[in-house]
Regions:
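Secretory targeting signatures
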Residues: 1-34
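Serine-hydrolase catalytic machinery in alpha/beta-hydrolase-like enzymes
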Residues: 38-123
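The conserved beta1-alpha1 loop
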Residues: 42-47, 154, 182-183
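Short alpha-helix in the alpha/beta-hydrolase fold that links the catalytic acid
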Residues: 55-60, 164-165, 189-198
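Active-site nucleophile loop of the alpha/beta-hydrolase fold
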Residues: 77-78, 150-159, 185
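Gly/Ala-rich beta-loop-alpha elbow adjacent to hydrolase catalytic centers
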Residues: 124-136
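Acidic catalytic loop of the alpha/beta-hydrolase fold
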Residues: 158-159, 182-190, 195
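Short beta-strand/loop motif that positions the catalytic acidic residue
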Residues: 174, 179-182
Length: 198
């Protein structure tokens, strides 16, 4: 497992450094000059998780150690009566078997993330883990915030929320370079192809 984590971190380091122009070349890079802000990553935990839980995962610890030039901001899902505890948005009212067509279902979290970006941004990238992946794609599709990179780990699209999914599909392809990762034994492995489609 440590070998897989190390290989993923090496790949991430190459992905980030290549696309930011940090290739060791003395020549100026268009990509390196395109982003002038600090290298901050907005990280979204999974449903039922927490910022501390995501931050404490061994793979995340390795990633932060391997990328000391990046600052990671771990957002906490808003605490709201309409949502489950530590979730970015609630399950559909009729359960996951009955897709929810409400296009505003994640507005509380979108507004919350807008506030985070305004107070702590700008952010170079957005990272989502599990339910943080669909929230990241919903946020990219429904806000005026732009990111250079998206890192989507073990996630999926909000297909049980057809209204939210429609807001993503209407603006697809999303204008952000993305690294999408899914583990072979992950219950959400189907999400890799879904996410790659937007």
């Amino acid at each position: 497992n440590n070998m897989k984590s190390g290989a993923l971190n090496l790949f991430l380091l190459m992905f980030i450094s290549t696309l930011t122009g940090c290739t060791g070349s003395d020549e100026d890079s268009v990509e390196a000059n395109a982003y002038a802000g600090e290298f901050k990553i907005l990280a979204l935990h999974g449903g039922g998780g927490s910022p501390e839980g995501l931050m404490g995962q061994p793979g995340m610890q390795d990633l932060m150690s391997d990328l000391p030039e990046f600052e990671f901001f771990f957002a906490d899902a808003p605490d709201h009566d309409s949502m489950c505890d530590q979730c970015w948005y609630a399950d559909p009212p009729g359960g996951k078997g009955e897709p929810n067509e409400d296009r505003t279902w994640a507005d509380i979290s979108i507004e919350y993330l807008d506030g985070i970006v305004q107070e702590y941004g700008p952010f170079y990238g957005i990272l989502g883990y599990s339910q943080g992946c669909p929230m990241a794609t919903v946020y990219i599709a429904n806000s005026n915030t732009s990111f250079e990179k998206a890192f989507l780990f073990n996630g999926y699209l909000p297909t049980t929320h057809s209204g939210l999914n429609d807001t993503i599909n209407e603006v697809a392809p999303l204008d952000v370079d993305a690294l999408i990762f899914g583990g072979e034994n992950d219950v959400f492995i189907f999400g890799v192809e879904e996410l790659a489609g937007v």
